[in-house]
């Protein structure tokens, strides 16, 4: 991912304020509500029958935290996203058979959640930088599929 020095600084500064557990749970929950076909990968999570059930599901929240933990690792290694996400790419491709388009969808949902949580602080320039990052992460996660 190519970010300018200013973009890297802005992304890092905002990410330092992110509550990974809260934002991760909301982002994954919204993915499952907005794109319900993604729920098939989470059948073991129990109740996903309504938006309230999804958003209140402790397994969704826990996995969302785990996902954003991995995203945090990516932010620390922006110059080597493919290497950083190689094992996760292999897992999601070979064992879980996740459609790689879902990575792009989750990235876009994450950007929406960040905008909702940070309001005016999440400027259009910061959004543009985060869009580059989530696109890079999605590409890295889809790498094993190619």
Curated annotation (Swiss-Prot):
Keywords: Heme, Iron, Metal-binding, Oxygen transport, Phosphoprotein, Transport. InterPro entries: Globin, Globin-like_sf, Globin/Proto, Hemoglobin_b, Hemoglobin_oxygen_transport. Residues 2-146 form the Globin domain. Pfam families: Globin. One of its GO terms (molecular function) is metal ion binding. GO terms for cellular component: blood microparticle; haptoglobin-hemoglobin complex; hemoglobin complex. Red blood cells. Gene3D superfamilies: Globins. The modification Phosphoserine is found at residue 50. Heme b binds at residues 63, 92. GO terms for biological process: hydrogen peroxide catabolic process. Belongs to the globin family. It is possible that either Q-127 or Q-131 be Leu and that L-125 be Q. Heterotetramer of two delta chains and two alpha chains. This is Hemoglobin subunit delta.
